[in-house]
Amino acid sequence: MYQQNAAGLAGTAFLMKSRGGAVRRRKVTRRRPTGRKTAARRRTDALRKAVRELIRRVKPRSPRQTGARSAPKSPESSYDFLRSGTPRYERDSRRPPADRVVMIDRESVWKGAQVPQPPQQPMWFPPWMMQWQHAPSRPCRAVLPAPVRIREEEGNAQIFKDARDVAEGNYLPRRPADGEADRDNRVRNRWSLEQVLRTLERIPARGRKLILTGLFGTAVGVVLDLLLGSPLNLTTRLVRLIVGFVPGGNLILNALDGLGYLMSRFPSNPLQITYDPGFQRLANSVQQNIPQGTAEALAHAAEQQVGEGFARNLAAAMSYLVGSAPSAAPMAIPLALVRPFRP
């Protein structure tokens, strides 16, 4: 057997001494079972005892049975709750008794009586029979989605616009009218100002007067009605020139330009725009912002460009207007005093 020498034992003892000495096997001392209880246990027992005593004092005692006692239950009667009240014929037999068989004669059938039928039970078919009795399903045709439409302008649109301006002689940059550069998806084909003026010249005089007076008021509407409906057949450029020089003329031109949105919705009957709520909002906005002397200045400019015949027509229109509508007399007085401004 291998045995260490003295040097080895000394080294081992030194190591064990440096680490705290050898590990000894100690016996675990166990406490002896005593009958003493802890203080917490004694308090708990005392509390339980007090609660039991309180319940015994408060709870009333059950009265004693003075009569004869009932016989003890037999062991069979303890299983009565397991027995069902269903008759035997319903539990063991599938056929109901004779008194429960429903018999209906011809008279009852004639009166509308029906035999109670059992509920329909789902039937099971093998898979091959299911495929046989159903028609073969036809595959649906694949519907290709419509291509996406991308709304974008052409890249060379500005080139064409510049060429058109050069051809027309519009070398200076022109400020577009309000609403001209807008994009409206609801109205694809918006009428231009020339098309609006041309349409107002061609429609009947009564409808034209109704649209213009409803949009610009009585005084300005009558003057514009005489300009557009005169037998002189004025061009749209001349009408725009006369209206453009007047204070508030840009507002009138912009309103007529905005009228192109409304007239494009009703191309067959332009008189329907008078019932449109957009037309009413436009008329309220224009009549609130138009200057006071626009009608007199417009009549003055038209008299200078057209001549003395315009003043006579205006006087006749004002006399008819005052006679038919007395409430329009204060607005017609300044226009009735307009005289030819020719030398």
Curated annotation (Swiss-Prot):
Residues 22-41 have a biased composition (Basic residues). Transmembrane segments: none annotated. It is found in: Virion. Keywords: Virion. Residues 42-56, 88-100 have a biased composition (Basic and acidic residues). Residues 18-100 are annotated as: Disordered. One of its GO terms (cellular component) is virion component. Belongs to the atadenoviridae p32K protein family. This is Structural protein p32K. It comes from Snake adenovirus serotype 1 (SnAdV-1). The lineage of its organism: Viruses, Varidnaviria, Bamfordvirae, Preplasmiviricota, Tectiliviricetes.
